[in-house]
């Protein structure tokens, strides 16, 4: 199947965008997308993200800039910082790119972001998600279109193969760059593309098309499942809380899916499999006061017959200056601020309350000191040399 320029243009036009933003790397995919999209009578902004990893990254940026000048298109470049230690470069870079795209999109009334993902990308993503053990949502892979907080993102080339895109570029004399780092198999996607896919092609020459079709089937199935779960979730919810007695009437598999959906709808974050299992066990053996830390930002509590998401206050909500001032007044010693760490409370935190021989869990101390449950979420843990020395604004430890 060859690329139909008119079909691609009509697909873009049906969204009636005020502005088109293109993620433009200079590679063949985004170069073909730029070449087609420039024919629209819609303001177009091409964005080049410089990852600062390749020796030729600046040359590529100049190539993209010159191409945009040739077609009289607006060009924006953005350089990424060094990836934080311990993070996956691929995942981190993807988040950084999307964050910058959305920053630019917010300047326009109805922007549409175009990305050059194609059928082979979809097949690779399906395999990556399968290797991770993902469910339907993960196996659905790369969405063809997705609503964003402001505007949307469309991938018009997703049904076309890499070979078809390269053929279009050759036929239309489109110049593009080649990134030889795509051959580096230390990156998982490159390993799958260069070594695993060729082996699978020996079994099925159309493997990319087949896996892409499987991803589409998973996407359709997941959409149906989410609609049904959303309807059920509404019937067992009270505002943002989940009614436990209604939830546990359902089959275990439905319970787990509803717990995942409930949390995602209210936080825009996903629960891990281990957290879902722990939550499922807790709601089927409910105990008022039970809680679990999901991340540094969210806690889930059981209060009587309801499952509640709590949003612990952060250091930004409480002035760090106020906490240090409180500590200075209540701690009878000199404070070296360079050794002080302030964080949110964790379920297993313990403190040796003054006058006691051994530490107790904070939950027990809160109960003994009759600190109301509604006030406990305000607690900030103050540490020195990795030891808890105080619980703001309640008491000193030690």
Swiss-Prot record:
One biological-process term from Gene Ontology? Answer: tRNA modification
Tell me its family: Belongs to the tRNA(Ile)-lysidine synthase family.
User: Which GO molecular function entries does the Swiss-Prot or TrEMBL record give?
Assistant: ATP binding; tRNA(Ile)-lysidine synthase activity
Stored NCBIfam families? lysidine_TilS_C, lysidine_TilS_N
| Full protein name | tRNA(Ile)-lysidine synthase
Q: Which GO terms describe its cellular component?
A: cytoplasm
* Enzyme Commission number(s) of this protein: 6.3.4.19
Q: Which organism is it from?
A: Francisella tularensis subsp. mediasiatica (strain FSC147)
Q: Which residues form a coiled coil?
A: none
Free-text function comment from the UniProt entry: Ligates lysine onto the cytidine present at position 34 of the AUA codon-specific tRNA(Ile) that contains the anticodon CAU, in an ATP-dependent manner. Cytidine is converted to lysidine, thus changing the amino acid specificity of the tRNA from methionine to isoleucine.
- Record keywords: ATP-binding, Cytoplasm, Ligase, Nucleotide-binding, tRNA processing
Q: What is known of its domains?
A: The N-terminal region contains the highly conserved SGGXDS motif, predicted to be a P-loop motif involved in ATP binding.
For this protein, what reaction is catalysed? cytidine(34) in tRNA(Ile2) + L-lysine + ATP = lysidine(34) in tRNA(Ile2) + AMP + diphosphate + H(+)
- One Pfam family matching this protein: TilS
Q: Which HAMAP family match?
A: tRNA_Ile_lys_synt
Q: Where is the protein situated, by its record's location annotation?
A: Cytoplasm
The main place the protein resides is cytoplasm
